[in-house]
Amino acid sequence: MFDKRVLNQKVWLGFLALHEVFLNAFEYQISARVGSFSRIAFNQSVINSKKGIYPTGSYVTTTGALQVDFSLLPKGIENHKLGFGVGGEIGSLAYDSTKFLIDEADPKAGFQPANWYYMGRWEGYLMQHSQNWTREQKAQNARPYVLYNLYLDYQYKDIFGIKLGRYPSKALFLSGFNQGFELFYRWKKFRIEWFSTFGRALANEQSIRDFYAPVNYKQKTNYGMHNLNLIYENKYIRVVPFIWFYPNNFNAPGFEITHDTKSYWKSDWRIQTTFYAWFPLYSDYLSKDYYRASLIGKKSAILFVFQRVHFRSYRFGWSVYKNFGNGSAQLGWNGSPVDPFYDTKDDTPYEDAYSNFYNANSMTINAFIGKSIKNLLVQLYGKLTYSPRADSQSLGVTFKYNLKKHIYLMLMFNGYQITMHKGYKVGFFTSGYNPDFAQTIQNRSYLMSSMSYRF
């Protein structure tokens, strides 16, 4: 009689031999992280939707992520690269201050939870349930997990490359993770890039969100948002004419001009100055709708200029962002060049978390100064936003500390006040000025912290 133990031994030995061959032929990297994020808000008011009164909302998350990246070509091949990766994250709300809140103006509407917005938001891939689900239903249908990485990446030298699947996005107007593809071709000092997205996801300690269509307006088909860049760059200047578009919704031509002293000025100083302009042009049917209580209209424009200065361990800078018309109605709230400078989504989740930075005809002024001390970064920043709908002011300080090699800590305090002008109301976006809405002033100050262990 055949001994099954011998067979099992041979199978395992064969598997180990193949595993050893694979390790010798290919490279791979395993990375993981566990962490927690918290936002403790100072405003824990009741909800009164009739008056436009809402709390800021406090919450605490716990998250864990695992990722594996492979190089699929033998180690001896130098000019060609072929990569594959898979990664996912799961999380939960350890605390949610909004879980059992009731609307004073409409008690029969049931509980009004809101922090599912950060941990597991899911209203359908096409956002088809955003209007017909209650807040409680949205909390019940939350998906605090996502397979954020599943990609194939080919590159020939620095001349040509293509990447497709799910992977981290570096696109100007898409933060988080992309579900789509991109490619580039370089010739001398020119580089052409194409980017297509059919889904966006978030995966970090603060937010988990499964892939959804980043732009889809009253359509049952996602046509994708697309981008073409033509980049010219030398050691003095970078010039990028570009266009972003979504079929049947909008076309947004624009350009970037950047001057950076890093490549030619050998000094303790580094000065980077960038100017962006883009011009969203909306379709006829979209132009008749409202975004953040303002008519979208046909034409709009956005100007953004910033300057960053580094001197030894110091850094400081400023920026100005100006909306002409309703430029953010389709492009910008899924990511924008502003994102590295300050958080544009730190309002109450009852306002979709978006700050008044996105309002029509708004102007936002920002400044910061910081210093690095070994593994500690301290940064002071301020932000002023003015718009017909609302004004806001914030002043905050952030501490970031890398403890040893794998542990990262962050602590932030932000004093933040929003004045909603007469005629507008928090959380009300579907029509324009209404004289029955009274002015409100609400405190949106918060304390944020995060900790993570990564390897």
Question: Predicted regions: what is each one?
Answer:
Residues 159-171, 176, 181, 192-196, ...:
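Transmembrane beta-strand segments that form the barrel wall of outer-membrane beta-barrel proteins
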Residues 94, 193-254, 260-340, 411-454:
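Outer-membrane beta-barrel translocator/channel fold
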Residues 20-162, 185, 398-403, 409-414, ...:
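Beta-barrel outer-membrane channel/assembly domains of diderm bacteria
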Residues 320-402:
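C-terminal structural cap/anchor segments
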Residues 64-72, 150-154, 181-185, 228-234, ...:
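Residues on the lipid-exposed face of transmembrane beta-strands in outer-membrane beta-barrel proteins
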Residues 24-28, 71-84, 158-159, 189-191, ...:
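Short loop/turn motifs that connect adjacent beta-strands in outer-membrane beta-barrel proteins
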Residues 26, 58-64, 143-148, 175-179, ...:
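Residues that define the transmembrane beta-barrel architecture of outer-membrane proteins
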Residues 1-27:
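Cleavable N-terminal export/targeting peptides
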